[in-house]
A protein has these predicted regions:
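Feature marking well-ordered beta-strand scaffolds used for ligand recognition
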Residues: 1-183
Length: 183
């Protein structure tokens, strides 16, 4: 985290992710280790939260950002102030998405690759610029999609610009380029 603390962000059974300060854990202050909760937004139920997420420093804005996939879709928070996570963008009401899975930004934070993990579902690629420019708060239409085989499902992915490394249960490792996200 940009505050210098080493943090562990964990999924839990609830409408949020827990943030633990590992310095407190190492020093034996277990009661103080839970330092924040990142909510899933207004659309979440009390029972479910995030499935998967990515957190990292965004140098263009000086923010620590959290990208979470879970109940209802996907959420992006500014978590620079851990006590007051600021919801920046939601990706809800997306056709075919009731629960987000893996959700990963490009290094500049403009695009995200989103997964849902069910058969026939492609990876969806979204452009976040309309939200970050203040035009909208929610994005619900992908600009493109990718799949190795429409009859199978992709499982997880990782971005190492400009490539997306994708694992599939039946298709193994696949790699595609995000150099032109709309193609």
């Amino acid at each position: 985290h940009s505050n210098g603390r080493v943090l562990l962000i964990a999924t839990v059974s609830g409408p949020f992710a827990h943030v633990y300060d590992l310095g407190h854990v190492v020093d034996g202050f277990m009661d103080d280790a839970l330092v924040a909760k990142i909510p899933t937004g207004d659309s979440a139920s009390d029972r479910r939260g995030y499935h998967d997420f990515y957190a990292g420093y965004h140098p263009d804005t000086g923010e620590d950002r959290f990208y979470g996939g879970g109940t209802g879709g996907y959420y992006i928070y500014n978590i620079t102030d851990l006590e007051e996570p600021e919801l920046l963008v939601t990706l809800l009401g997306i056709s075919g998405v009731t629960r987000g899975h893996t959700f990963t930004p490009t290094p500049d934070g403009r695009y995200v690759v989103a997964e849902t993990e069910y058969q026939y579902a492609p990876l969806r690629i979204f452009d976040l610029e309309p939200a970050f420019e203040g035009e909208v708060k929610n994005i619900n239409r992908p600009i493109s999609a990718w799949t190795a085989d429409w009859q199978h499902l992709v499982h997880n992915h990782e971005i190492r610009w400009p490539y997306v490394f994708v694992s599939g249960y039946l298709d193994g490792l696949q790699i595609f380029s995000l150099m032109d996200p709309e193609d």
